[in-house]
Structures are given as C-alpha cells and as structure tokens.
Amino acid sequence: MSITDGSRVGIASPHIFPDGTVDMAQVGRFVRRAEELGYASLWTQERVTGRPTLLDPLTFMSYIAGLTSKARIGVSVFVLTRHNPVHLAKQLASIDQMSGGRLIVGVGLGANADDLLIYGLDPQRRVRRFVEHVEIMKALWTQTPVRYSGDFYELDNINIDPKPVQSPHPPLWFGANADAAIRRAVRMADGWTGAGSSPRDTFTARVKQVHDMLAEEGRDPKDFPISKRVYLAVDDDEKRALRRLKEWCAYYYGNADLPERVAVWGSAAKVQEQLAEWSEVGVDEFILNPVFDMEEHLEKLAELTGLS
C-alpha cells in the first residue's frame, strides 16, 4: 500500500540535536538525499528558548535552499507575534527568491502566551497582533507602496523589494487548534497544519471542522491543503522504538507519554499501514518526523511510502 496516491510526503530535516552537537554535515547529506528520493518538502520549526538544541528556522531554510533545487522548504510553525512583520516579510521574501519560489510559511500563535513577555509584548493582545502581522506581511509582498494603520503598527508609503517569487506570495499555512483559530485560518490562510502533538481523533474532528468552515466561507478545499506532522519510528523491535520516541518527547516536550497518543512506530509494514490510515483521514501533505537515526529513516520512509 502506498500513501503517496492521496498525500504528498515531506520530511523534517535534522535541525534538533538532542546530544547538543550541531552536525551540519548530516544536514547536507540528508537534504540532498531527500531531494534525490523524491520527498516533496523539507521542514524545520521554531523554538527560541528552552532545553532543545535547535537551529533558527530562517537561517536554516536559507542554508538548505542553497543545497537543493526541487523540494519545497517549510517551517511549521513560526510563532508569528515574536517577530516584527516588516522585517520577517523581507526575510521570507528573500528566502523565497533564494529558493526559486519553494517556500511554505507555517505560522501560529504558540502554545504559551506568556512567552511573549520575553519579547516585551503584551500576551493579552496576541490575537489582534497576529492578525496585523498577517495583514502587513501580505500587503508588503503584494503592494508598493503599503499604507497600513492598525493598533500596533503604522506604515506610511513602505515597500520591500524584492517581492517573493511566488504569486501572490508564499503560501501561509496556519497552525491552529481552537475553534476561533481554525476559523481565522480558513478566512486568512492558504492551508492548515495539524501539530505533531495532536492525536488522530482530535485531528480527524478538526479536519471535518476545517472542511465545514471552508464550505461556509465559499472556499474550495482543493485550494486549501491540510498537513500533519507525524512523529514516527521504524523498528521491528516495537518496545525499543517506543522507548526512543518517549525519550525524545521527554526531551522536546517534557512529556514522555505523548508518543502513545500521537506517534507511529513498529515494523515498516505497520508504519505503512498507519500512515495510510492518516492519509485517509484527510492529510494532503505529511511532515514525517523521525527523531533518531535520521538518515536511516530517510531511506526506510521513502521505500514504505512508495517514493523509491
């Protein structure tokens, strides 16, 4: 059974280094080989503070853009309100140019509102700030000059150049879980992405909700891709696979119990079967996320998903 019949297959690039040692040689080997194998997209994510040793996504995407030529390059997700929207719009337009129009921009509010205090921002107004960021970035990517008056930003005859390669702009995929956030995604975004920490039953319900809201807004679901990050481990020794997933989730999330609710593990046949089930739920693009033995998983996952 191949999951590629109904879903595109992307993969998380090595950008988290639990042993504390950043291995750029591995990154280079991985992304080049991923493109050779036919993966549709290469992904990173954002976390600024905390325990994980994790590379900055803007810098990382710029780097792998120069190592690849076909695979799309995505982040899932930026906590958008941490960033200045003018500066971020310029950086992302530059990466879209550098990659030849291959950028996907995942954005979200973030799970911890109080995190914004680090940046001198009021967490109580983060939703309004998020909306302004999206509006400003879209305007800067598509208009010259831009005039904008909001609660937080005033732009008077501002422009950025170069504009992105993609027209009208790089796709914005919102990470969203709450009802209001999903409604906002359907109205403002170009796609929706389910978190790696989202169990299948929750994700399934959210997919239905997205489709219902798209119908209400008069939008075609064919033009609104749904993606899902899936943590996984291919190993005939299921106990060992689960143990290693638990160790990684304890490191990254502080929650060793998470894999039993959200991850896929076991033999190649079992992982293939479970990914096919995820595909049937409504995943248009997988962000497959192995958490150890990255290069070995790159090959195994290409085979079991039908890429090679």
What residue ranges belong to the model's regions?
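N-terminal beta1-alpha1-beta2 module of alpha/beta enzyme domains
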Residues: 1-67, 168-170, 291
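Flexible, glycine-rich active-site loops centered on histidine and acidic residues
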Residues: 2-23, 81-148, 152, 195, ...
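Acidic (Asp/Glu)-rich catalytic clusters
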Residues: 2-3, 32-36, 61-70, 92-103, ...
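Hydrophobic faces of well-ordered beta-strands that scaffold small-molecule active sites
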Residues: 9-13, 42-44, 73-76, 103-107, ...
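Active-site mouth loops of central-metabolism enzymes
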Residues: 11-25, 78-86, 166-177, 232-233, ...
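Short, acidic/polar
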Residues: 21-34, 87, 91, 174-184, ...
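Conserved, mostly hydrophobic/aromatic
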Residues: 34, 38, 64, 95, ...
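Alpha-helix-loop-beta-strand connector modules within alpha/beta enzyme cores
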Residues: 55-75, 131-136, 140, 302-308
